Amino acid sequence: PAPDSSFIRDP
C-alpha cells in the first residue's frame, strides 16, 4: 500500500 495512505484521515 502507498505510504501516503497512512497519514490520510477524516477531517
Curated annotation (Swiss-Prot):
Segments traversing the membrane: none
Location in or out of the cell: Secreted
Cellular component aspect of the GO annotation: extracellular region
Domain of life: Eukaryota
Gene Ontology BP, a term: neuropeptide signaling pathway
Coiled coil regions in record: none
Keyword Aminoacyl-tRNA synthetase: no
Keyword Endoplasmic reticulum on entry: no
UniProt keyword annotations, A-Z: Neuropeptide, Secreted
Extent of the signal sequence: none
Family: Belongs to the FARP (FMRF amide related peptide) family.
Function: FMRFamides and FMRFamide-like peptides are neuropeptides.
Name of the featured protein: Extended FMRFamide-10
Classification lineage: Eukaryota, Metazoa, Ecdysozoa, Arthropoda, Hexapoda
